[in-house]
Amino acid sequence: DAIIAPPASVGGHVTHHAAGCAGLYGLTTHEAPVAADGYGLDLDGLRALAQRVRPKLITIGMSLNLFPHPVAEIRAVADEVGAKVLFDAAHQCGMIAGGIFADPLAEGAHLMTMSTYKSLGGPAGGLIVTNDDGLAQRLDAIAYPGLTANFDVAKSAALALSLLDWRDCGA
């Protein structure tokens, strides 16, 4: 299967490419075209690439962010080819929780991944979230055991406290 992911030049994550999980699972990654400003995706180029390679997944979100991502427009491209949209919010999740960065799920992303420690301020770890019950059930079925090897109660308690802080003080 094919996926489209931002290139490293705009902060696309290695796990979405051949050297990371995508490659380990036999996925073919096509680099998303970058806009002329060098900091966002070229929507027309993305649409043309998606029509040509028919990806199962389009990932967006990257570590170099000067502007919000056009999630709704990317979702429209994904819908045209039957792909899902994954927003990598590792660097934005604290700003999303605080209400100063748009919520990718509300804008149309099917999935959002995030670090629990970078801008969120919790313990080391990560989360995958979705508003789609079917996707949530599929993820739950492969998460443990499968994609993860353990469940750390202490880390979960620390994360719960961080999330309570965001609920009470973040927005």
Where are these regions (language model features)?
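Conserved PLP-enzyme active-site core in the AAT-like
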Residues: 1-171
